[in-house]
C-alpha cells in the first residue's frame, strides 16, 4: 500500500484454507480470511480494492461478495462458456436464463465480465446452468475445432470436464454442425455481447 498498490487480486482464493477431510474449496475460514484481508486493506487505504478469482460454480462464486464485506469484484466465470455455447449451438436459452437470474452487484461491488482468458474455457462455472447433454455437445464441438479437454476427478468419483483448452477465435469457427465461414462474425458478436 505504501508503494501505491490499490488493487489486490486473490488468485484461486477458493482453495486458500486447507482442512483434512474436506474438499478444501470454499471453506468458511476462506471467507473469514477474505473479510479480514479486506478490513485491513480498507483501514490502511480506503480506496484500495480486493478482486477474487474463483473459478467455481456460479452460486459459489457469488458468495465471495459476502454481504459487501468480502471481495469488491469477482470475475463472471459463467459468461465465457455460456456465451460460446450460445454462439455454437444457436440457442441463447441458457445464457439468457443465467443473465436474468444474476443479482445486481451490491453497492461497492462489481462483476468483471470477460469472454476469454489464458486458462481456457472453464466448465465448473456452468455446473447447474448447462445440462450434461449440452456440455457433452459443447465438448464434442470444441474437440472437432482442435480444443482439448482437461478433466478433474476427486477420489472415488467419476471424472468430470474441468475446462476446454482452446482460443476463443478457434472456439467460434463454426457451430455444432461443423466449421463454416461465419467464425469472424461470431467472434465479433461475442465481443459486442460482452
Segments from the language model and where they lie:
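Active-site and adjacent substrate-binding regions of carbohydrate-active enzymes
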Residues: 1-194
Amino acid at each position: 500500500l505504501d508503494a501505491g498498490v490499490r488493487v489486490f487480486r486473490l488468485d484461486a482464493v477458493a482453495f486458500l484454507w486447507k482442512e483434512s477431510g474436506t474438499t478444501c474449496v470454499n471453506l468458511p475460514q476462506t471467507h473469514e480470511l477474505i473479510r479480514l484481508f479486506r478490513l485491513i486493506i480498507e483501514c490502511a487505504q480506503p480506496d484500495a480494492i480486493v478482486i477474487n478469482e474463483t473459478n467455481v460454480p456460479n452460486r459459489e462464486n457469488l458468495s465471495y461478495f459476502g454481504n459487501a464485506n468480502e471481495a469488491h469484484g469477482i470475475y463472471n466465470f459463467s459468461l465465457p462458456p455460456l456465451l460460446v455455447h450460445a454462439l455454437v449451438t444457436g440457442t441463447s436459452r441458457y445464457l439468457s436464463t443465467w443473465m436474468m437470474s444474476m443479482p445486481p452487484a451490491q453497492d461497492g461491488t462489481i462483476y468483471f465480465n470477460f469472454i476469454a482468458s489464458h486458462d481456457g474455457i472453464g466448465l465448473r462455472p456452468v455446473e447447474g446452468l448447462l445440462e450434461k447433454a449440452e456440455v457433452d455437445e459443447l465438448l464434442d464441438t470444441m474437440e472437432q475445432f482442435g480444443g482439448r479437454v482437461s478433466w478433474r476427478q476427486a477420489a472415488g468419483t467419476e471424472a468430470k470436464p474441468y475446462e476446454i483448452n482452446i482460443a476463443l477465435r478457434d472456439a467460434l469457427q463454426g457451430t455444432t454442425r461443423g466449421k463454416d465461414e461465419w467464425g469472424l462474425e461470431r467472434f465479433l458478436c461475442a465481443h459486442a455481447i460482452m
